[in-house]
Amino acid sequence: MFLGSHTPRLDDKGRLTLPAKFRDELEGGLVITKGQERCLYVFPMAEFTRISESLRTAPVTAKALRDYSRVFFSSAADDAPDRQGRITIPAPLRTYAGLTRDCVVNGANTRVEIWDAQRWQAYLESQEESFAELSEEVLPGVI
């Protein structure tokens, strides 16, 4: 499970150092792809395979599935952390997420999200008021 928020920097070669606590789960390989709200999703290879299998068994006649799958898979890149725990984020994905030097790497349960630091801060500010309301809708009776 991925938890917490970290603030690594992107180097000039498009490499980002993963938080140490995330590396063990990602050392066997990972997939980076477009996420929602202009962030990037990083999945351990096993989780990405599970998602792929789920999408593969869905009916190809569903237009929404075709549309989503095209974007999700065509933007995906596989990688593995190097000895320093760095991954290389391909230029098209850096552009999509608006990544500059300062990034935020968030644990999001089964995935990691990579955000541009300014974009993450703006997202947090926009969600602050609705957070309490969403908990009632998303987690009724759980918390």
From Swiss-Prot:
Main location: cytoplasm
UniProt-listed PROSITE patterns: SPOVT_ABRB
Keyword Repeat: yes
DNA-binding among keywords: yes
Gene Ontology BP, a term: negative regulation of DNA-templated transcription initiation
Pfam families referenced in this protein's UniProt entry, alphabetically: MraZ
Keywords carried by this UniProt record: Cytoplasm, DNA-binding, Repeat, Transcription, Transcription regulation
Protein name per UniProt: Transcriptional regulator MraZ
Species name: Frankia alni (strain DSM 45986 / CECT 9034 / ACN14a)
